């Protein structure tokens, strides 16, 4: 346990040097001394009733004076009030813990004894349990609200049994439990003024937990087969085990197929986006084609000799082409002029020969 202490601050005294404060009360924030005691859970499990610690505690109890309900509520018993609660506590769950918590909080100072029924009586009167009696004993004794555990508690509890344990009160819910010769097992404790009523936790019980397991039986069997349990350990036949294994394979393929489709969807989005970027009018392919055309047109024209002030690129190519065409035209004109001159010479020679001939030659 730990103790938290807050100290009270001293008040300021009046002085003669401040007469203006004589008729004014000086108030200062102060807190009273408070001791907050909180019990912490033990790091040891609760003892069994036949162990030395429980026996010593029981023998030290003065059971000669009957503890009434009023005395217990007012914490006037002079010792911890001993309360007994019993049950099967199969598959110990929060509904069981809530019942024991309610009992522990009945009075300011409670010593809680929990009786756990053994397998023999439980199987006889209620049916088979999921966990064994030893597992149920250990499950209860590790609950923080429990001070002592009574193993193989009687199925039909009696007043004499409680007195032997020096129990002051017995706690249970208000549902009647039929016993041989009795309509309600706990009615006699009501008459003795020893009965305390607890409330059941709605929505949870051992039967509900078992019902959930049965409802989803196939899922749990398939899961445990995947985890390495053998069909024999699960009490499953060969055909049933084969069916579950096939179902597991089918589910695995479905899962992989869904994953593949999801991956393909994301990849297809990327492919479509790349296609649009490539073949769009402003895309990469058209830009590449434009660059390729420019390169090919430049490769077909002679490279200009680089000098300062000379045109470059397409302009230079066009200027060069015009100059070549002009030179070719001049050459053709020269050839034509030369042919005309030659033709004139031939005509002159023929005319001179004709003049030199006599008439007899004709």
Swiss-Prot record:
Family to which the UniProt record says this protein belongs: Belongs to the cytidylyltransferase family.
Pathway where it operates: Phospholipid metabolism; phosphatidylcholine biosynthesis; phosphatidylcholine from phosphocholine: step 1/2
Stretches with biased composition (Acidic residues): 321-331
Enzyme nomenclature, EC number: 2.7.7.15
One of the record's GO molecular function terms: choline-phosphate cytidylyltransferase activity
Disordered: region residues: 1-25, 296-362
Regions of compositional bias (Basic residues) in chain numbering: 346-356
NCBIfam families linked to this entry: cyt_tran_rel
Binding site for substrate: 126, 155
UniProt gene name: pcyt-1
Residues binding CTP, per UniProt: 88-96, 126, 172-173, 177, 200-204
Basic and acidic residues bias (residue ranges): 1-16, 332-345
Catalytic activity: phosphocholine + CTP + H(+) = CDP-choline + diphosphate
UniProt keyword list: Lipid biosynthesis, Lipid metabolism, Nucleotidyltransferase, Phospholipid biosynthesis, Phospholipid metabolism, Transferase
CDD domains from the UniProt entry: CCT
Protein name as catalogued: Putative choline-phosphate cytidylyltransferase
InterPro entries in the record: CCT (IPR041723), Cyt_trans-like (IPR004821), Pcy1-like (IPR045049), Rossmann-like_a/b/a_fold (IPR014729)
Pfam families, per the entry: CTP_transf_like
Name of the top EC class for this enzyme: transferase
């Amino acid at each position: 346990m730990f103790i938290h202490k807050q100290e009270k601050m001293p008040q300021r005294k009046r002085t003669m040097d401040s007469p203006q404060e004589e008729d004014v009360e000086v108030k200062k924030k102060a807190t009273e001394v408070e001791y907050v005691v909180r019990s912490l859970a033990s790091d040891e499990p609760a003892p069994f009733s036949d162990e030395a610690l429980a026996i010593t505690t029981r023998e030290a109890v003065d059971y000669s004076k009957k503890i009434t309900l009023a005395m217990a509520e007012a914490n006037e018993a002079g010792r911890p009030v001993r309360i007994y609660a019993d049950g099967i506590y199969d598959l110990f769950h929060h509904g069981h813990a809530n019942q024991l918590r309610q009992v522990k909080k009945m009075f300011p100072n409670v010593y809680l004894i929990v009786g756990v029924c053994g397998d023999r009586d439980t199987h006889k009167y209620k049916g088979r349990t999921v966990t064994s009696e030893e597992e149920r004993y250990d499950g209860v004794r590790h609950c923080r609200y429990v001070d002592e555990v009574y193993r193989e508690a009687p199925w039909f509890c009696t007043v004499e049994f409680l007195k032997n344990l020096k129990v002051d009160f017995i706690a249970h819910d208000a549902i009647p439990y039929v016993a041989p010769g009795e309509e309600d097992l706990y009615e006699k404790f009501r008459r003795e003024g020893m009965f305390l009523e607890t409330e059941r936790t709605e929505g949870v019980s051992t039967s509900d937990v078992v019902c959930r397991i049965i409802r989803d039986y196939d899922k749990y069997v398939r899961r445990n087969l995947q985890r390495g349990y053998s069909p024999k350990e699960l009490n499953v036949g060969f055909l049933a085990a084969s069916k579950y294994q096939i179902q597991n394979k089918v589910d695995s393929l479905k899962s992989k197929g869904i994953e593949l489709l999801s991956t393909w969807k994301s990849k297809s989005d990327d492919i479509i986006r790349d296609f649009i970027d490539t073949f769009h009018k402003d895309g990469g392919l058209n830009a590449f084609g434009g660059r390729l055309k420019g390169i090919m047109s430049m490769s077909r024209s002679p490279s200009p000799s680089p000098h300062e002030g000379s045109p470059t690129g397409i302009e230079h190519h066009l200027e060069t082409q015009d100059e070549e065409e002009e030179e070719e035209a001049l050459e053709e004109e020269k050839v034509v002029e030369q042919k005309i001159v030659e033709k004139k010479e031939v005509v002159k020679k023929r005319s001179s020969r004709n003049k030199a001939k006599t008439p007899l030659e004709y």
